[in-house]
Amino acid sequence: MSPECLVIGNGIAARLFALECKRNIIDCAVLTSSPVYFNQVRTITLNPISFKFLQKLGISLNASPISHINVFESEGTGVINFSAQDLGEDNLAYVINYDNLLRQLDELTKDMQRSADEIKDLSNIKVRVFADKDKKFSKYQTDFDFIEHDYDQIAFTFHATASKLQRNHAYQTFFNNQIFAIMPINDIKNTFTVVWSIPKDFATEEYVRDNIDLLGQQLDTDIAISGEILAFELSSSRAKEYCIPGKCLIADSAHSFHPLAGQGLNLGIADIDVLVDEFKKAKSKGR
């Protein structure tokens, strides 16, 4: 029998949406395939609301809290400091490992997952929800128009050690059309995760390795790369409409932005919260 709702996607957002539907007794299945992992390199930064949302779903999180964010402009003397205490919060953000979260979500949604071969007839499904831009599922998502922009940048992410940075602090610096952010990860002393956005003209792994010491000097610490370096091309995309009759977009399928904003999954979780609430209202009215 076909589910009332089908969420389509291969990442974290699709599985989170399915779990939230299940928690609210909404009939939902996930059209997905084997998850893609990143060798424990990729990380996610959650705001306090998103962190509490995952806790509400019973997800176990090994998170590295950020209580302060320090932003520098390397060509001047400007510094902006943000503190959780100033906002009355325990922390400003939490850094978690992407692979660990996806692996846990994949296990929690096993009984809800369906393959394309299992769901060939979509006529009895009331609502299809698209949760990412996985090319495997692009054929299902053809009724939406998007506004897109190429940032002409590549983001490099990797783990690093830094001996003089404070444990619960995140640091961000702007220089030469580049953005460098370093944040705590794994609750291991002096271990951090880095996201470094570099113009495509000179964005290479060699450039990253050759210039990491300069970033360390700007932050008054030594920074040493540890392990693999991942690279992602950066662009933004926003749907002109998020919902049409029988179809909705959430998370990366609806909008994607520069990692500078730190919104990523946070916006996706907000989408999930709002859309499932609308489903609950419709269900209470017998729709």
Regions found by a protein language model. Give the residues of each.
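Hydrophobic "anchor" residues on beta-strands that sit immediately upstream
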Residues: 5, 28, 126-128, 248
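Short beta-strand/turn micro-motifs composed of small residues
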Residues: 9, 32, 73, 132, ...
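Short, glycine/acidic-enriched loop or turn micro-motifs at the edges of active sites
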Residues: 35, 135, 255
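Conserved N-terminal helical subregion
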Residues: 52-56, 64-157
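Conserved FAD-binding catalytic core of PHBH/FMO-like flavoproteins
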Residues: 125-128, 132-229
